[in-house]
Amino acid sequence: MSFCKLVSFVLILHLLNSCLISCSSNDLSQIPKNFLSLAKREDFFDWMVGIRRRIHENPELGYEEVETSKLVKTELDKMGVSYKNPVAVTGVIGYVGTGHAPFVALRADMDALPIQEMVEWEHKSKIPGKMHACGHDAHTTMLLGAAKLLKEHQEELQGTVILVFQPAEEGGAGAKKIVEAGVLENVGAIFGLHVSNLLGLGQLSSREGLLMAGSGRFKATISGKGGHAALPQFAIDPVLAASNVILSLQHLVSREADPLDSQVVTVATFEGSDAFNVIPDSVTIGGTFRALLPKSFEQLKQRIVQVITTQASVNMCNATVDFLEDETPPFPPTVNNKTLHLFYKNVSVDMLGIENYVETLPVMVSEDFAFYQQAIPGHFSFVGMQNKSHSPMANPHSPFFEVNEELLPYGASLLASLATRYLLDSSSSPNKDEL
């Protein structure tokens, strides 16, 4: 590159950086495009890829995210971003902007899953039996990317952005602990996102209202009378009883639920004897149940108890059911605020065009982001990463799950754009001035 061209490039980049927000006060639609351009810079992209790979190599389960939190704090320190830690055991809460109202929050989850990674690549998990199989490494990276974009334009922010690096989304209800910690008081809105292997790279998706199901867990112990497998007549077989229970539980959805009222019951664990010739005294089964509507969720919960105890009794066994709520509360449905969804859609279309926005149907997965939405207006969305020219990607929670790192600039710039535009829209409204 010639000296003149180099000078011209530097001047253009300086102008883009210096007027990213101030110029956009006259043309808000340019903010997402400008942030995306900055996030796609080679140096910025390489920085995000490096962070994501470091997190991926060292996965930590819920409330164990010690090293992940250290990485987050180190990067925030480099940016000059202030933060609180620990919050909700291992969480980190960062602050960018004026320190005064209005306040808007951005959230990323940090925890991994107890899964052995089966993808062979240079940055495979170094921790046996643990893997980032749901993209939380990418979520954390994208929020750090958003923090960097926002910090570079902090003087132009019309309020304060709260960066929520949350622990324990995978069953630990870390969001609930964040809310209970009181760090989101006076926050006007919170935004979160999730990677999607079903959407094309550069596509964004969400919907107004009901987005994801409420979910709960159950564990049932079915007790009979143990004995020799060759002499079943002298035993009361809890394995057979549990098998009948599992089949009967499937009738709750196929024969009792309205087909237009989506529900799911899945038995995912079955534990009995370790010996091939022993009928055990008891069997333990466990699983998840989900529903989009709170009323249906409660009805399903009641029927699970009835079916398990009654079917056990028919087979001359006893049964107890535990919904494990002392360990983890059930997750409410994820419901997007109507006003925030319209706002999100406008920002998404401004960034990538209407052709890259997809209005999704409700899905039966669940998210503890719903706990934020119970406390303050919130919006959750999906960022696509599927390369249409390649074979379909593995689903989340698979040992073969992979993240297309090309999506990182899209998520980082979307989060930064949502926060910036929200503060600009809210700066003229009355707000409480302290967190």
UniProtKB/Swiss-Prot annotation:
Keywords: Endoplasmic reticulum, Hydrolase, Manganese, Metal-binding, Signal. A motif (Prevents secretion from ER) lies at residues 432-435. It is found in: Endoplasmic reticulum lumen. PROSITE patterns: ER_TARGET. Gene3D superfamilies: 3.30.70.360, Zn peptidases (3.40.630.10). Coiled coil: none annotated. Mn(2+) 2 binds at C134, H136, H194. GO terms for cellular component: endoplasmic reticulum lumen; nucleus. One of its GO terms (biological process) is auxin metabolic process. GO terms for molecular function: IAA-amino acid conjugate hydrolase activity; metal ion binding. Its EC number is 3.5.1.-. It holds the Pfam family Peptidase_M20. Mn(2+) 1 binds at C134, E170, H397. Residues 1-25 form the signal peptide. Belongs to the peptidase M20 family. Hydrolyzes certain amino acid conjugates of the plant growth regulator indole-3-acetic acid (IAA). This is IAA-amino acid hydrolase ILR1-like 5. It comes from Arabidopsis thaliana (Mouse-ear cress).
